[in-house]
Amino acid sequence: DQKPELSLPAVADRVMEALGKYDFIVTNFANGDVIGHTLNTAAKLEACKHVSHYLDVVVHDALAKGYVVAVTADHGNIEKLYTAAGKPDGAHTTNLVPFILMDPAHSGPIALRDGCLGDVAPTVLNVMGIPQPAEMTGKSLAEGHDFGKDRKMLLIICDGWGLGSGDDGDAIHLADTPYWDSLLAEQSWSKLHASGEHVGLGSGKAGNSEAGHSNLGAGRCVMQDDVRLD
């Protein structure tokens, strides 16, 4: 918690170096999970500020270079500051996570449906015009949108970045996050399940990075070890 920005400036630089070189780029902003596990409220607010700032930097560059950009999360964490007993909370949550989609070739809103993490990879394939394999049982979150041909895409995963309560117990709400606020106010977005049976965990169980990233990449619900062993 002594360096809430972690290596995010360097991560952002690497992403921007890759823009224009690769058709598909995926990056992980780890601050929400790493700093979210601490009990340091000031550090959490600072981490949220850095995530918002570097989203602004990276997303603007990607859109200017013609990339379709999606911003989502693998599970919740940093948004919840306190337990039900009012004590500092550093655990993962069962909160929904956002899925924001921006298409620089389209000026109007994009119709998005709510879903789960297993729907993200099919959405990527939809954007890029790649046939979806039978093994992916998820469905595109933007089935009705015409992305055209030969599109490039940037997927940003904000680790541990759930949709919180929107009050004084919500770090993202309290933090100085003007760009994040503008994304929710101005861009098309939907809500994704990132916990419990929706990601192959036990019912009611908080999401985690392993379940989150495996579902995001697989395009389906991946049964996790705690369920498989039961």
Task: Go through the PLM ranges and name each one.
Residues 1-230:
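Feature captures the catalytic ectodomains and active-site-proximal regions of enzymes
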